[in-house]
Amino acid sequence: FAAAAEVTPTQADDARGTVAEARTWLRELLADAVLVLPSSAGGAPARDASAETIEAERAGTLRMSCLAGLAGAPAVSLPVLRTADGRPAGLCLVGAPGTDLDLLNLAHAIEGSTA
């Protein structure tokens, strides 16, 4: 909240404009495609990971996972990947707004093919 209190009205207006441009671009991209990306910036952190490691993972994941919310688009994560060192990782599918059921059907097909 402290950081938000420092944002000026001009900065907020500029940010809203950037968000609107990004939303339009993402929706155009997703109109006839599904975005496929990792569900997180890396694999699951170790149980004994430091707070700094966990925060870095969270921040990296937030940068990637905000795309669906920014576009108002459905997304689903599938626990079907592993990192090179064997840690669990997910695959995220992002579809166009309004394609929720199609996206779930695709996720189901992918999950079935990796079982």
What do the predicted segments below correspond to?
Residues 13, 70-115:
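Structural helix-boundary/capping segments
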